[in-house]
């Protein structure tokens, strides 16, 4: 199965009539493995800051999480494993696996919990398979 299939079928899946607005699977170096068509163009330093927060949980809290130039307020997640962010009626969830970052971006009416569930389901599967 291609990485694009994981994005299209597992991250952009429908949950209770809603779905993520965009999603991606990135290498921990910021290389794009697969992404949805509307995933924001991010800067390398944004991925570096995200990876730093996984290494030192809470480092993004004072400045916020930036992805594609959009600032998200970091909310409490699972230190070292999940970084959730909020912006207005939407937000982002990022899970770190052994080799990748799974990123889901959502808008209302999807809830943060639904986004977390989608991202964590794929992320946990990849962790279980060693990726």
Curated annotation (Swiss-Prot):
A single cellular component GO annotation: cell cortex
GO terms of molecular function: actin monomer binding
Keywords: Actin-binding, Allergen, Cytoplasm, Cytoskeleton
CDD domains assigned: PROF
Biological role stated in the UniProt entry: Binds to actin and affects the structure of the cytoskeleton. At high concentrations, profilin prevents the polymerization of actin, whereas it enhances it at low concentrations. By binding to PIP2, it inhibits the formation of IP3 and DG.
Subunit structure: Occurs in many kinds of cells as a complex with monomeric actin in a 1:1 ratio.
UniProt-recorded name of the protein: Profilin
Organism: Arachis hypogaea (Peanut)
